[in-house]
């Protein structure tokens, strides 16, 4: 009887140890989640333009970062996608400034957000790492009376000891993303161009 109890105990301990080992070996997610901050602008009710917003992703590289860990190349992607993030940002921006966002056919002004860069370059040595992030987007306004464009750019760098991973990359890229979003929210030139060039 004592032998049976010892076998049961050892089996339970073995299963627990194997479970913990396998849990520790699970692959880290290659998705980094982003949430745009909310705009703080007060609504201007005198806006008459109905604006159609589209976003396109012109980045040369689709992942937002890549690095090597234990000899394996890790490629990171954004969730929501970069296109969805900037679509949400621009729609929130225009609504907060009093514009109505409409469909392509029912609008008298068209805004296109062209995302040119959104990513982190990872440099890793034996004892230090360096992260360089850059986000660049150009906003195009088209109306019956003319067109306008403006570029938004934000860069950040971070250095640290040993190797960078998802958490470090996410932290510096989130800071860069929040900064460019706030720059878009604080900008008044795009709203002025919509008013000027819409019919």
Curated annotation (Swiss-Prot):
User: Which superkingdom, per the lineage?
Assistant: Bacteria
Q: Where is the signal peptide?
A: 1-24
Q: How does it sit in the membrane?
A: Lipid-anchor
> What keywords tag this UniProt record?
Cell membrane, Lipoprotein, Membrane, Palmitate, Signal
- GO CC, any one term: plasma membrane
InterPro entries from the UniProt entry: Uncharacterised_YajG
Residues with covalent lipid (S-diacylglycerol cysteine) sit at 25
Q: Where in the cell is it found?
A: Cell membrane
- What family does this chain come from, according to its entry? To E.coli YajG.
User: What protein is this chain from?
Assistant: Uncharacterized lipoprotein HI_0162
């Amino acid at each position: 009887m004592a032998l049976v109890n010892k076998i049961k105990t050892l089996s339970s301990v073995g299963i627990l140890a194997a479970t913990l080992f396998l849990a520790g070996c699970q692959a880290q997610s290659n998705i980094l989640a982003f949430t745009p901050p909310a705009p703080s602008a007060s609504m201007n009710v005198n806006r008459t333009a109905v604006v159609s917003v589209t976003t396109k992703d012109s980045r040369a590289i689709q992942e937002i970062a890549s690095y090597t860990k234990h000899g394996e190349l890790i490629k990171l992607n954004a969730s929501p996608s970069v296109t969805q993030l900037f679509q949400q940002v621009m729609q929130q921006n225009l609504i907060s400034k009093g514009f109505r966002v409409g469909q392509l056919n029912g609008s008298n002004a068209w805004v296109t957000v062209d995302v040119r860069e959104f990513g982190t370059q990872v440099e890793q040595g034996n004892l230090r790492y360096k992260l360089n992030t850059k986000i660049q987007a150009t906003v195009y306004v088209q109306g019956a009376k003319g067109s306008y464009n403006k570029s938004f750019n934000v860069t950040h760098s971070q250095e640290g000891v040993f190797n960078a991973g998802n958490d470090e990359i996410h932290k510096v890229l989130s800071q860069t993303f929040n900064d460019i979003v706030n720059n878009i929210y604080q900008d008044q030139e795009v709203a002025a161009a919509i008013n000027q060039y819409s019919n």
